Regions:
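C-terminal domain-closing interface element
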Residues: 171-200
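A conserved beta-strand-loop-helix scaffold within acyl/acetyltransferase catalytic domains
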Residues: 1-116, 162-163, 178, 194-200
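Residue-level detector of functional hotspots within protein domains
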Residues: 20-22, 69, 90, 125-127, ...
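Acyl-donor binding region in acyl/amide transferases
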Residues: 101-167, 174
Length: 200
């Protein structure tokens, strides 16, 4: 968040063609009369509905969700926010957000209906609006996703830490990571060139 006043201010920094694409995506959602509401102080009933959407996302791919409903209910002390998409008085999708002192984190989502651009609106555009509105310095929508670049998410290099007990396996992984880091650096530079901003 570079001190944007609102989503329009954020979009004003895009090149014209990319700005039009985002507006077109958002207009399609608005024309379907899909609205959004933020929920904090999340009750068990709200978690139940969120989890249904989350689980459906996996079921569509023939998979089981790797997190349980009980896991999500344990997160209440972290003061998360759920943004629900609703249409005709029914919730149809939801995205889960966490916050730190300066960062909004978008992590999990799910939908009852498969609607074009609903994922982008619920997880990214609503998240951007929330980050601007609550003056978060950063909005982290999660790792990976080429589609995030053209929506204004600048690439960052992240790290994860692991301990591998087997020393031979640990050495092989270490060597792979050293080699991979060169490819990541190259990809990072290429990703910067694809950003939609006028000053890039």
């Amino acid at each position: 968040n570079k001190g944007y006043e609102d989503f329009e201010d954020f979009l004003s920094k895009f090149v014209s063609r990319k700005r039009k694409n985002i507006k077109k995506e958002r207009d399609l959602i608005k024309r379907m009369n899909i609205k959004f509401k933020k929920v904090s102080n999340i009750s068990d009933t709200v978690w139940d509905e969120f989890y249904l959407f989350y689980a459906l996302t996996y079921a569509r791919r023939g998979q089981r969700p790797y997190l349980t409903l009980e896991f999500f209910k344990e997160l209440k002390n972290l003061d998360p926010i759920i943004i629900f998409a609703h249409k005709d008085d029914y919730n149809i999708a939801a995205a889960l957000f966490f916050k730190s002192s300066d960062t909004l984190y978008g992590r999990y989502w799910g939908a009852k209906e498969d609607i074009n651009f609903l994922h982008f609106e619920t997880c990214y555009y609503q998240g951007i609006e929330l980050a601007i509105e609550q003056k978060f310095k950063y909005f982290d929508p999660g790792i990976q996703g080429q589609h995030k670049l053209k929506r204004g998410f600048e690439p960052i290099i992240n790290s994860s830490y692991h301990w591998i007990k087997n020393s031979e396996f640990r050495t092989a992984i270490k060597n792979f990571c050293i080699e991979e880091s060169q490819h990541i650096e190259l990809y990072f530079k290429q990703a910067l060139k694809t950003l939609p901003f006028t000053n890039v």
